[in-house]
């Protein structure tokens, strides 16, 4: 009888622990979610154009952050989520505010900066496969969005961006 009672108590404790340690945290409860990926794979095809000393920071597969699910709040922008995910993952990110565009401009991610791979290189973002023609601070995310930050070596042509085209 004592063994049965101990087993029952153990099962109750296990159930309590599983409930307390579920998939969502207090901070995550009721949050919206998107996925974020950061890639610089185009650099792999342009290593000769890369500034000296930068080759060591480019991952072998060109992926700085694999597709990662991120919780966000109503009203958060692509920039807000980029800041949060980079901080959480220990990825260096540098930006500056650009008044002309009323948005943050991403200068560098993972120590890979604009112009590190030629005059037409820098960071661009897409959401759900679309390349917005405005800054990342101006794009308010929706639940389920997929954000990809891509390093371009050719003003977006090498990553599939069709900026300025109908």
Describe the residue ranges of each PLM region.
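Ubiquitin-like/PB1-type beta-grasp interaction modules and other compact soluble beta-rich domains
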Residues: 2-8, 12, 16-166
